[in-house]
Amino acid sequence: MAKKDQLTLRGPLYGNNRSHSKTITRRKWNVNLQSCKIKDTNGKVTRILVSTKTIRTLKKQNRF
């Protein structure tokens, strides 16, 4: 399974590590994915992987 948010499709971000001696190595920041249950329009409960940022947004919209 891909490490992506199933609602917003947010994936990992890529960048550089910078040490004190200024050497550069590539690194990856993964999204903080959590499994949660959500109701669809028919009232059916499904389990999806979403990021914690998306969970906060859903709680603010009372859709969680």
UniProtKB/Swiss-Prot annotation:
Keywords, ordered alphabetically = Ribonucleoprotein, Ribosomal protein
Q: Which SUPFAM superfamilies match?
A: L28p-like
GO MF terms, alphabetically ordered: structural constituent of ribosome
**Gene Ontology BP annotations:** translation
Q: Which InterPro entries match?
A: Bacterial_rp_bL28, Ribosomal_bL28, Ribosomal_bL28/bL31-like_sf, Ribosomal_bL28_bact-type, Ribosomal_bL28_sf
Which Pfam families does UniProt cross-reference here?
A: Ribosomal_L28
Region annotated Disordered, chain positions:
1-21
An example of a Gene Ontology cellular component annotation for this protein is:
ribosome
The cysteines covalently paired via disulfide bonds are: none
Q: Which PANTHER family match?
A: 50S RIBOSOMAL PROTEIN L28, LARGE RIBOSOMAL SUBUNIT PROTEIN BL28A
Recorded family membership = Belongs to the bacterial ribosomal protein bL28 family.
Name recorded for this polypeptide: Large ribosomal subunit protein bL28
